[in-house]
Amino acid sequence: MIISAASDYRAAAQRTLPPFLFHYIDGGAYAEYTLRRNVEDLSQVALRQRVLKNMSDLSLETTLFNETLSMPVALAPVGLCGMYARRGEVQAAAAADAKGIPFTLSTVSVCPIEEVAPTIKRPMWFQLYVLRDRGFMRNALERAKAAGCSTLVFTVDMPTPGARYRDAHSGMSGPNAAMRRYWQAVMHPKWAWDVGLNGRPHDLGNISAYLGKPTGLEDYIGWLANNFDPSISWKDLEWIREFWDGPMVIKGILDPEDARDAVRFGADGIVVSNHGGRQLDGVLSSARALPAIADAVKGDIAILADSGIRNGLDVVRMIALGADTVLLGRAYLYALATAGKAGVANLLDLIEKEMKVAMTLTGAKTISEISGDSLVQELGKSLPAALAPMSKGDTA
């Protein structure tokens, strides 16, 4: 199969993975309206083409939290990454490390902190949820610090799990889920051999290390359902600061007032995110939410963004809308499921090339030169007639 874009990796991953795993990462909440709008809204951001600008000295390098990044991209935290490729977190981290960008380990990773951190030279980031079990949170923070993690990504948009209908149909949950997953694995021998048999243990490494016993998929679903904490408030940041003195990024911001609160409570960064459309359907896409948030806090706090980013052009669009750096989630997981470390490395190379093309044709030599001036129009304003939805009676 020819791989020329992230969409090719998605198609390949769908063939490789058992349906319960593919749809778990590919799907969203409820009717998946926000999931679709994340991609569609970003694709409608029109860039301003410029010519004769002497683009011979192009640089994608940027700095974030005193770290130098080869390009303004980091790999987002993704749960169960090790179910998509053999020891998937280790492979993805290696690809990010080789590219010179951060890798973020999820709380609910298959590979524990202590397995991933020693395999890379660059300090990785660690993602944490607010959970009822504060003992686990403290333990995770202490272990992350001991392993040399540089930045904490604190996910706040999940006080309760979203309603994901696809999971019930695919076998991740629902009636006879375990039996359905077993037969799906049998029908996908490549995955069954590489990950199902040789990728063990399949427990949640960070949680198992704390509980002192293996924590498998069924335990994962139950443990998360029982431990998400709806009482989460901004005061939890003060508690976390007692155990974490490094950069802290608040992930899951969609409203300018919440962004201002993040500044007031001393966060170092925010991630403009709707959890990839996996939590509350019907909320704004990240691309639509980003400009107002940037207007409110740009310069006061680092602004990261995720949800809907599929290529280097999307990265440039997000930066033009106000982000300093973006996080990749689904895109890199499709590549990981298809070809492991090599797949993620190739995807990052593709994104780098796509960014260079976009920057060359918009006249931006450096990341700092990508701004609102790079846009023909911002989201939310009237579309040109050629792009506006057809009204009744119009014909294509």
Swiss-Prot record:
PROSITE patterns xref list: FMN_HYDROXY_ACID_DH_1, FMN_HYDROXY_ACID_DH_2
Membrane topology of the entry: Peripheral membrane protein
Family matches, as InterPro entries: Aldolase_TIM, Alpha-hydoxy_acid_DH_FMN, FMN-dep_DH, FMN_HAD, FMN_hydac_DH_AS, LldD
Catalytic reactions of this protein: (S)-lactate + A = pyruvate + AH2
Compartment list: Cell inner membrane
Binding locations of substrate: 24, 129, 164, 278
Enzyme Commission identifier(s): 1.1.-.-
Keyword Protein transport: no
FMN hydroxy acid dehydrogenase domain span: 1-380
GO molecular function: FMN binding; L-lactate dehydrogenase activity
Active-site feature positions: 275 (proton acceptor)
Domain of life: Bacteria
GO biological process terms held by the UniProt record: aerobic respiration; lactate metabolic process
GO cellular component, one term: plasma membrane
Residues annotated as binding FMN: 106, 127, 155, 251, 306-330
Function recorded in the entry: Catalyzes the conversion of L-lactate to pyruvate. Is coupled to the respiratory chain.
Family designation: Belongs to the FMN-dependent alpha-hydroxy acid dehydrogenase family.
Name this polypeptide is given: L-lactate dehydrogenase
